């Protein structure tokens, strides 16, 4: 039986009022070192980007919510691929990059707090934000790339990945992005964009995979 490492083991704040990225990453690293399960228990966990490792499972208990912070300074800018272009951009809230044998499961939720990112793109009334500035310059095509937003879950250059049962909602950009990967099993995940003011809240984007 795989060892289980719980958020309560590390006394990680679950009120959603304190940023707990470092503590959650420590839990993930501990699970990976032991080829075990990082169990996020019921509660709300305010976080920036988390990076999963090979031979582990991230399990979101029912009632558990990973709540993406809207403080952009908390997100690193890394080489990635967004909307078909290689560029430096924000990673996801949950990331599986260059890993193998990783599972994300459970009845919990990844919540991107999309309203912040949507308003960044085109304001509260779809006539402002980056879009207004870029439209005025005749650069509509570039707005999607220059207006960095956060995806909820990114799988990049990885293999033998399972995504099962969790909910992805209110993503700042695409909800689930699987890119340059193989043997990815997606089963029973629930995706909601929420809101007519949400630009590019695609559900699941399978990009250059086999």
Feature map (PLM): residue ranges:
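Extracellular/periplasmic carbohydrate-active domains that bind, remodel
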Residues: 1-210
């Amino acid at each position: 039986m795989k060892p289980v490492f719980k958020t309560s083991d590390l006394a990680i704040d679950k009120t959603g009022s304190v940023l707990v990225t470092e503590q959650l990453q420590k839990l993930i690293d501990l699970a990976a070192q032991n080829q075990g399960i990082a169990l996020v228990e019921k509660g709300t966990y305010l976080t920036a980007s988390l990076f999963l490792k090979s031979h582990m499972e991230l399990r979101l208990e029912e009632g558990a919510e990973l709540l993406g912070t809207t403080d952009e300074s908390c997100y690193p800018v890394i080489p990635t691929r967004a909307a078909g272009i290689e560029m430096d951009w924000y990673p996801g809230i949950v990331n599986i990059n260059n890993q193998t044998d990783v599972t994300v499961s459970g009845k919990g939720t990844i919540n991107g707090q999309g309203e912040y990112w949507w308003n960044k793109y085109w304001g509260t009334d779809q006539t402002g934000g980056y879009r207004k500035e870029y439209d005025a310059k005749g650069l509509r095509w570039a707005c999607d790339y220059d207006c960095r937003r956060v995806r909820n879950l990114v799988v990049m250059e990885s293999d033998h990945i399972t995504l099962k049962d969790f909910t992805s909602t209110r993503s700042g950009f695409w909800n689930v992005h699987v890119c340059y990967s193989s043997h990815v099993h997606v089963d029973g995940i629930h995706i909601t964009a929420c809101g007519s003011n949400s630009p590019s809240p695609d559900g699941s984007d399978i990009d250059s995979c086999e």
